[in-house]
């Protein structure tokens, strides 16, 4: 049975560490628990690093963490988070954990995913009909691998027995919510203040900066087009359609790109699509021709030539280096 959430008990919070897990995400999730113990003057939480069979797991920065065995120790945890990094080949190595994660979920243990950990939860079948999130960079690969799933663009999502978070520093916000859930908002505020985390974000807060910050412009017509470019990847819209969306003429749209971006409409759109393609090459199992068509190119050859011009390597060479 899942451990009690009674505030008098010590909650064991497990972290299933996937090889090359993101150390910042792990620290952002565990340090608030340590601070809660310190501020309360008694143990409220026990941090339990986990791995199949135990042993040590190295983070993306090379720091190794000693782990208990997931199978034998998971049942005593109140929550088990899957903490992963950015390498799909590492996510694939977690298949041996899927059965255990499903079993723990059936026992009433909350299961979570941090950074790309939601990909592992999806592969285990734990995200069907659930609200969840994942790091924005991994969302395209997840949607390609699991078309029936639709991650939310949120910093974190608490959906009953499932807790997911985009990673980075967002676990600070998620842990604030989870501590408040158990111990009240006043105590959670004390924990966040301990880390100078004064601006605690709401769950639905965005993971990324605004389009204006990302693209370095505040022009409303240009921003409308740039944001549409980020979503209209597989079936790119032509200049006329984009100009209509922005409420300007095609000629005016061209002028906006030259004046504010220093590059043309087509060049900007192509770069956005190619950067999306690069993420799919690194993180998805799609073939190169499938990625070419999924990013709006008329042929794999056209895609390969454009990719090489921008990144100075072919899609095939990047795929081999990524090990996908």
UniProtKB/Swiss-Prot annotation:
Q: Matching InterPro entries, A to Z? A: Class_I_gatase-like (IPR029062), DJ-1/PfpI (IPR002818), Homeodomain-like_sf (IPR009057), HTH_AraC (IPR018060), HTH_AraC-typ_CS (IPR018062), INH-QAR (IPR052158), Tscrpt_reg_AraC-type_HTH (IPR020449)
* Residues of the DNA-binding region: 240-261, 288-311
The record's section on Gene3D superfamilies has: 3.40.50.880, Homeodomain-like (1.10.10.60)
Pfam families membership: DJ-1_PfpI, HTH_18
Keywords tagged on the record: DNA-binding, Transcription, Transcription regulation
Which residue range or ranges hold the HTH araC/xylS-type domain?
223-321
**SMART domains listed in its UniProt record:** HTH_ARAC (SM00342)
State one molecular function term (GO).
sequence-specific DNA binding
Q: Which PROSITE patterns match?
A: HTH_ARAC_FAMILY_1, HTH_ARAC_FAMILY_2
What is this protein called in UniProt? HTH-type transcriptional regulator GlxA
């Amino acid at each position: 049975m899942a451990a009690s959430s009674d505030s008098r008990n010590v909650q064991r919070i497990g972290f299933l560490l996937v090889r090359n897990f993101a150390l910042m995400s792990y620290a952002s999730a565990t340090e608030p628990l340590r601070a809660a113990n310190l501020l309360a003057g008694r143990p409220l939480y026990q941090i339990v690093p986990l791995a199949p069979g135990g042993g040590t797991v190295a983070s993306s920065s090379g720091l190794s963490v000693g782990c208990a065995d997931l199978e034998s120790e998971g049942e005593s945890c109140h929550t088990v988070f899957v903490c992963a990094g950015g390498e799909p080949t590492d996510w694939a190595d977690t298949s041996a954990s899927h059965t255990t994660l499903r079993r723990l979920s059936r026992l009433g243990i909350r299961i979570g995913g941090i950074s790309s950990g939601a990909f592992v939860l999806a592969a285990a079948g734990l995200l069907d009909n659930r609200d969840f999130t994942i790091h924005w960079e991994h969302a395209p690969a997840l949607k390609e691998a699991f078309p029936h799933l639709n991650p939310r663009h949120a910093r974190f999502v608490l959906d009953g027995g499932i807790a997911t978070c985009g990673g980075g520093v967002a676990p600070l916000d998620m842990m604030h919510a989870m501590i408040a859930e158990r111990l009240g908002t006043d105590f959670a505020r004390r924990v966040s203040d301990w880390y100078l985390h004064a601006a605690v974000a709401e769950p639905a807060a965005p993971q990324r900066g605004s389009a204006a910050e990302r693209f370095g412009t505040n022009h409303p017509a240009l921003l409308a087009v740039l944001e549409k470019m980020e979503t209209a990847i597989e079936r790119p819209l032509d200049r006329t359609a984009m100009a209509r969306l922005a409420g300007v003429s095609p000629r005016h749209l061209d002028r906006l790109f030259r004046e504010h971006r220093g590059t043309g409409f087509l060049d900007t759109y192509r770069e956005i699509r190619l950067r999306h393609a690069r993420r799919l090459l690194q993180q998805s199992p799609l073939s190169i021709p499938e990625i070419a068509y999924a990013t709006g190119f008329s042929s794999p050859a056209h895609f390969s030539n454009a990719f090489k011009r921008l990144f100075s390597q072919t899609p095939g060479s990047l795929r081999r280096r990524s090990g996908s």
